[in-house]
């Protein structure tokens, strides 16, 4: 298999279609600096995501978005393709109420990356993520209400989300 800590039992479960084992393999392969292992990480994460593994969906979306941002200046067309992949997987994870995916998806709507810019939808996604416990979304929502970014300024809501974020961090 490789020099990575992959047990035969884990590999066999992944090969048998166990999405949790597939995602675990993806995470192990991703720890390597080897390009072949990184490709295997993507392959196993895709298998897990296609079988409904929500964290794998988010993981792929984040990975594709990161890669797209890196490629933006060098190859805008390739970057766009990866932003589209990122959006698709983040949207899938968001449908399953994955808080971090909702927050990242909000950025696509805020910036207009591969979707039409929609500040209202962006704010709604941040709010959903905050309500699901995503601390960064709580901080973002406090700032949104404090400065009136796509909403009316509302100091009461800003204070509420600021306090909620602080409480969640304790």
Regions found by a protein language model. Give the residues of each.
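Residue-level detection of beta-strand scaffold positions
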Residues: 26, 30, 43, 57-58, ...
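Structural signature of tandem alpha-helical TPR/SEL1-like repeats
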Residues: 2-8, 35-44, 70-89, 116-125, ...
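Canonical positions in the second alpha-helix
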Residues: 11-13, 47-48, 91-93, 128-129, ...
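Short helix-capping/linker turns of helical repeat alpha-solenoids
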Residues: 16-18, 31-32, 51-54, 67, ...
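Alpha-helical tetratricopeptide repeat
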Residues: 7, 11, 19-23, 58, ...
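Hydrophobic face of amphipathic alpha-helices that form TPR/SEL1-like repeat modules
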Residues: 24-31, 59-73, 102-111, 143-147
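Eukaryotic tandem repeat interaction scaffolds
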Residues: 83-110, 119, 126
């Amino acid at each position: 298999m490789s020099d990575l800590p992959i047990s035969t039992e884990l590999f066999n479960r992944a090969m048998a279609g166990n999405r949790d084992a597939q995602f675990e393999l993806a995470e192990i392969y991703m720890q390597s600096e080897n390009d072949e292992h990184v490709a295997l990480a993507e392959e196993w994460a895709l298998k897990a995501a296609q079988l409904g593994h929500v964290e794998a969906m988010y993981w792929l979306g984040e990975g594709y978005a990161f890669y797209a941002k890196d490629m933006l200046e060098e190859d805008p067309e390739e970057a766009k393709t990866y932003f589209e992949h990122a959006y698709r997987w983040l949207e899938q994870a968001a449908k399953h109420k994955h808080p971090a995916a909702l927050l990242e998806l909000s950025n696509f709507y805020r910036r207009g990356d591969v979707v039409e810019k929609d500040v209202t939808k962006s704010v709604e996604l941040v709010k959903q993520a905050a309500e699901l416990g995503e601390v960064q979304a709580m901080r973002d929502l406090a700032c949104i209400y404090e400065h009136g970014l796509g909403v009316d300024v509302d100091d009461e809501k800003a204070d509420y989300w600021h306090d909620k974020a602080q409480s969640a961090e304790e």
